[in-house]
Curated annotation (Swiss-Prot):
Assembly: Homodimer.
Protein name: Chaperone protein DnaJ
Gene symbol of the encoding locus: dnaJ
Positions annotated to bind Zn(2+) 2: C163, C166, C189, C192
GO biological process entries: chaperone cofactor-dependent protein refolding; DNA replication; protein refolding; response to heat
Amino acid sequence: MARDYYDILGVSRDAGQEDLKQAYRRLARKYHPDVNKEAGAEERFKEINRAYEVLSDPETRARYDRFGEAGVSGAAAGYGDMGDMGGFADIFESIFSGFGGVGAGTSRRRTGPSRGDDLRFDLKLEFREAIFGGEKQIRITHLETCTTCNGSGAKPGTKPRTCGTCGGAGQVRRATRTPFGSFTQVSVCPTCNGKGQVIEDKCETCGGNGQAQVTKKLKITIPAGVDTGTRLRVSNEGDAGQQGGPAGDLYVYLFVQEDPEFRREGINILSEVKISYLQAILGSRLMVNTVDGEVELTIPPGTQPNTVLTLENHGVPRLGNPVSRGDHLITVLLEIPTRISAEERELLEKLAKIRGDRIGKGGIEGFFGKVFGG
């Protein structure tokens, strides 16, 4: 008994076209004969193609839903007949373009210039470095074009020859007949590994790769206002390209270390300051730490616990516009003494009487509760 086409693709019976397409891409890549050499993979691949051919067409899908396999016998074209398959041919070609594509029209030369790979470098910054920016020196290792052979991979005085297997195309084609039609498979040339050239006398410096690993120092400019997750791009500092292609880029990912005193919230900086109950009642002026150094902070009379006071323009510069800065927000914490002298107690009790506060049972703590809204 034939397997259910929905089960073959691993989708529900109400799956939409996008769900079908995604399932097909995933399974076709997994079971393609060039990728999967296990026994039964080719038959599984044929099942997947048959199921997608039927279900991707609304008309044949409707017949299949009503009559099953009997309703679509002979309806599918088979994956060798790309001319009548419309969108199916497009998706099939796009899926396998990574290893050669399918059909006579999909052959692509792999020779010629190719861009180098991009590289990633993780960089830790101190809290203040992220706020104000500056320069950092880093050490990276990347591939550069071999200076001995100028990237050809061949020993100086010699040059690569055209691959005799693929004729310089970098790909070979193999025609296979299946129950579903003729299948032309294009794959990377096994002789030259897709380069189209064979190096007989390899460069002694790079071993025929045309590239060599080099460790170098770079100065990175850190803009003011960066944060964890900010990514900086350094052009052309990735791996060198091949066959004269451009180099890739270096991407520097920033990670900002925590500060024991300050926290960051967007472009604002947060910190705390402890004051005495007398400073809270009478008001005060005191020096507090900011990223710019010590700054005078005014404590208004009657300041309540957890009041947030603002020092404008002492926060983080706005990334891309360092003239504009956030604020420094300071949370006021109140220090209530656990012990006081007899003289202090006497004075506080006199003050409580003047205010008309009863402090009998709660003692002087009850007085503080009244004063600070407790």
